[in-house]
Amino acid sequence: DNNGDDKPDDKKVLFNVIGGKQHDHGIHAFCFGPDGKLYFNFGNASRGLKTPDGKIIIDKAGNEIKDHRKPYQQGMVFRCDPDGSNVETLGWNFRNNWEASVDSFGSIWQSDNDDDGNRGVRINFVMEFGNYGYRDEFTGKGWRDKRSNIEKEIPDRHWHLNDPGVVPNLIQTGAGSPTGIIVYEGKMFPQLLNQVIHCDAGPNVCRAYPRKNIGAGYNAEMMPILSGGKDKWYRPSDVAVGPDGSLFIADWYDPGVGGHGMRDLERGRIFRVIPKDHNGYSFAKRNVNTLDGAINALMSSDLESRYLGWKSLHKMGIDKTEKSLMKLISDNDLSLIHI
């Protein structure tokens, strides 16, 4: 959008994939990280990442980004520059990972879906360059194949969790159809600060996953935020944080879920979630073309404002911005977690 009319003025292809176009195991979303890079993923239908002219991309580690166990396979997570260059493969061996979310400290979180019906939906802390166990690391065999030290329970067996080198899951949530995910960095819900919030269209629920440190990673518990109850057409597909810190949940509203199916093409809903004692919807307007406005945007609850602030500050350059940013950091204000 070059002229501010909220309409794209041109279109540029960043990547192609081998397969999985218009597929629920394909590419779904990009996320802007605090390092100025783009984060994204694809499920196991995509099978590889290609340049716009169809060449397999070689990542920064010198490997082909391709499902061929050298070393990558199945679904993958990536990081790249805004123009699509300098691609890094951050994790692999997922099945149907939907979206990667990056918090202000650079940690990456996502969900993954099991072979439907095996109660193995999982949330992952993406430890960079990790193998996440959907298929055997060396043979590519599935979880049903016999192997030594096989897990007792199918949800654990599904991800080869006893195999050496497989990164443990943050939490497994049972059956479901996981969709959008964020890390909450607003002030309206202090009990959710820095916690993962995630939609699951299968059991008709949006949940938070408060976590605790364990070893080099984390574990978590489930905390429902907005459930469908008796309304089985409630299919939360994404969650976002508003500039005031409230939550917005998108519901595609359909009787079914999965398998590319949809029966209601006309209706959808958006819910806003606020504390019981909160009224209204207001937030400060910012002019990101000024230094103060860009810094204030960088401290916003919502990622979109932070992106605009980050972009403006980088355009201004270090000579104009460094003094003000260093003063803010020295103030030690909780709202500065986004810098």
Report each predicted region and the residues it spans.
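Beta-propeller domains with acidic blade repeats across secreted/periplasmic ectodomains
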Residues: 1-296, 304-315
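Flexible loop/turn segments at the boundaries of HEAT repeats in alpha-solenoid HEAT proteins
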Residues: 283, 319-324
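Short inter-helical turns and helix N-cap capping residues of alpha-solenoid HEAT/ARM repeat scaffolds
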Residues: 301-302, 332-335
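Conserved small/polar residues in nucleotide/adenosyl-binding loops
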Residues: 337-339
